Amino acid sequence: LQKMRAWPDAPKTACPSPAAYMKQFLDDGDNYIVTLSGRLSGSYNAAVQAKTIYQDEGGKGNVHVFNSRSASSGQVQVALLIRELADSGLPFGQVVEQVETFIDRMKTLFVLETLDNLRKNGRLTKVQSLVTGALRVKLLMGATREGEIEKLSQGLSIRQTLARMVSRMAEDADHAGRRLVIAHCNCPERAEHVLEMVRQRCQFGEVQIVPTSGIATVYANDGGIVTAY
């Protein structure tokens, strides 16, 4: 994180190659791949290529690639649901169908301390990033149904914007009883603060806190909070 802050250019990331995915496939089992939003990373396309090559070469295992249309906490949500459904004994096709339906309904909300890495990698307009940095405005962002980033609101401080994020959850009639995953980038205390607000205002059936990792850490950057339900 310190090296990324000090480096003036975009942090370089690379998605797994199709061959790297294929090395993990099981010929005698079900293979589920969950990727970062296809609008943010080449991981989804690489995984789809891996599936195609594997099947063309006569691979016998079942393979499905899930485009989470989210990041970090959203990927965790999808992975948890896959495990729950598979462990319950559902056949491969039904697991895929139910998880794809869940992804269609999943909501992703996030607040970042800085937008620099998103800007440097072309995920935000340069003007938007420079303006928010100059004004010290913190944006409440979300994911569209296609997995693209959109601005939802803003605040003058990160605590104010996090509070607005929780308010948005509380006002969503569909959130009650669902699982919320809170992912944090090097800020566990901030995640706990969000959890406390959620407990006071929302009716989630379950809440989990997880750290970001991999490419999600690059985009969330130090202090970022990414939620999905």
Regions flagged by a language model, labelled:
Residues L40-S43, A47-T52, N62-H64, S70-Y229:
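Mixed-charge interfacial surface used for oligomerization/domain docking
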Residues M4-W7, D28, F102, M106:
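Alpha-helix boundary/capping residues
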Residues M4, G29-I33, Q55-F66, I209:
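Glycine/charged-rich beta-loop-alpha catalytic/anionic-binding loops adjacent to active sites
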Residues S17-A47, Y54:
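N-terminal glycine-rich phosphate/adenylate-binding segment common to multiple enzyme folds
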Residues W7, Q24-Y32, E206, Y229:
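Generic structural signal for short, solvent-exposed loop/turn connectors between secondary structure elements
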Residues L1-A20:
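N-terminal glycine-rich anion-binding loop in soluble enzyme alpha/beta folds
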